[in-house]
């Protein structure tokens, strides 16, 4: 496992639940095509799994 994850928001948050929007805000993803680099921790991986249909992840 690599030490960092590169996470990109590929779908809009419009029409999602409030919990999914909270997860996206927690990841720092506010706009489509925004990319963040975060540490590969179990907490981050769990958040990514909650919104896996909306993001693209590269290790």
UniProtKB/Swiss-Prot annotation:
InterPro entries: Ribo_uL30_ferredoxin-like_sf, Ribosomal_uL30_bac-type, Ribosomal_uL30_ferredoxin-like. Disulfide bonds: none annotated. GO terms for biological process: translation. GO terms for cellular component: cytosolic large ribosomal subunit. It holds the Pfam family Ribosomal_L30. Keywords: Ribonucleoprotein, Ribosomal protein. The keyword Cell membrane does not apply. It comes from the Bacteria. One of its GO terms (molecular function) is structural constituent of ribosome. NCBIfam families: rpmD_bact. Part of the 50S ribosomal subunit. Belongs to the universal ribosomal protein uL30 family. This is Large ribosomal subunit protein uL30. It comes from Geobacter sulfurreducens (strain ATCC 51573 / DSM 12127 / PCA).
């Amino acid at each position: 496992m690599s030490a960092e994850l590169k996470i990109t928001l590929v779908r809009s948050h419009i029409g999602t639940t409030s919990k999914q929007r909270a997860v996206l805000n927690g990841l720092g993803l506010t706009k489509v095509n925004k990319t963040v680099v975060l540490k590969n921790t179990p907490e981050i991986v769990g958040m990514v799994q909650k919104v896996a249909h909306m993001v693209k992840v590269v290790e």
